[in-house]
């Protein structure tokens, strides 16, 4: 069977939304889902880049599988999301073939720069491993807000903290791909963080929750950026920077207080390379547990030799798409 990778035009994107509603339209009507997708696709990612939809077709023009690509780091790191195969085409390897074709296309496009493709799987690892992806540690800390007493959230450090109302207020925010010997970091761009907040505002409107004007909390050198997940009733930390456990506690205390005020029962923060591990039970004292993220397993496909021996560390929720 001869298969071809095809970039969808705007009309095809809308038609595909009607199909993928089955997979990602939970808690939404079809009309709401269609509005969500068109609004998120209209978001500006900078660099003249945008979200693109890719279709794997056979000779008859049937769409066998589809996905979207996101410009995480301009011409270096691409994110893959919304991989979808209709039930009648499942079990035939079409999603794997779609990603193989896409990886080949991006490899040819990368222009000799360190580059990679990332995704976050909600269907396990095997299907993506066959396309050349490998999984990395995917845990998160879940803080149960109703078990955190007000006393635990009091800040006794004297740190001057301010809420973030504009992401451009974050001084020294790192963006892009950073390589350090055998490790590398991928930082979500401010455009991607704004995409998360656009998503929050869409759900806030659908669920009559309004739109929050607070995007996180900062000190003179540290910050937490968060979003309110109305779909899963959680405050999610998108990006963070702190230099010790004292700063970490102060920032998280503010996140918990804000979640309580918004009626969110949980605060969730991704954990990679034991950045947060063990501190919650010792330094912090918050009611928390570390769990594997079965609905967003981080996976990466390296496109360039520069990163083959590297270890992807410090994964932030802000990279999710």
What does each model-identified segment do?
Residues 20-74, 179-214:
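Active-site rim helix/loop that mediates acceptor-substrate recognition in acyltransferases
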């Amino acid at each position: 069977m001869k298969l071809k990778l095809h970039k969808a035009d705007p009309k095809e994107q809308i038609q595909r939304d009607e199909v993928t509603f089955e997979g990602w339209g939970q808690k939404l009507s079809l009309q709401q889902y269609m509005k969500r997708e068109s609004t998120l696709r209209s978001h500006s990612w900078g660099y003249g880049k945008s979200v693109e939809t890719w279709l794997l077709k056979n000779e008859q023009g049937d769409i066998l599988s589809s996905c979207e690509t996101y410009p995480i780091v301009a011409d270096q790191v691409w994110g893959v999301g919304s991989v979808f195969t209709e039930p009648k085409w499942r079990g035939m390897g079409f999603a794997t073939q779609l990603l193989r074709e896409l990886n080949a296309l991006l490899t040819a496009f990368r222009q000799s720069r360190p580059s990679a493709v990332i995704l976050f799987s909600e269907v396990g690892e095997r299907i993506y491993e066959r396309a050349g992806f490998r999984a990395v540690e995917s845990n998160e800390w879940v803080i149960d807000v109703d078990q955190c007493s007000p006393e635990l959230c009091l800040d006794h450090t004297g740190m001057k903290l301010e809420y973030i109302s504009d992401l451009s207020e974050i001084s020294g925010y790192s963006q892009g791909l950073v390589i350090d010997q055998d490790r590398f970091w991928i930082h979500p761009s401010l455009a991607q963080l704004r995409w998360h907040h656009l998503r929050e505002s869409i759900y806030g409107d659908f669920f009559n929750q309004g739109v929050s004007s607070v995007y996180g909390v900062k000190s003179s050198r540290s910050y937490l950026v968060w979003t309110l997940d109305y779909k899963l009733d959680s405050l999610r930390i998108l990006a963070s920077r702190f230099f010790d456990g004292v700063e970490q506690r102060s920032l998280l205390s503010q996140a918990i207080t804000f979640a309580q005020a918004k009626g969110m029962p949980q605060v969730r923060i991704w954990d990679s390379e034991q950045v947060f591990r063990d501190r919650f039970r010792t330094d912090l004292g918050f009611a928390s547990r570390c769990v594997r993220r079965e609905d967003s397993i981080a996976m990466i496909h390296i496109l360039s030799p520069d990163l083959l021996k590297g270890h992807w560390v410090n994964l932030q929720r802000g990279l999710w798409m």
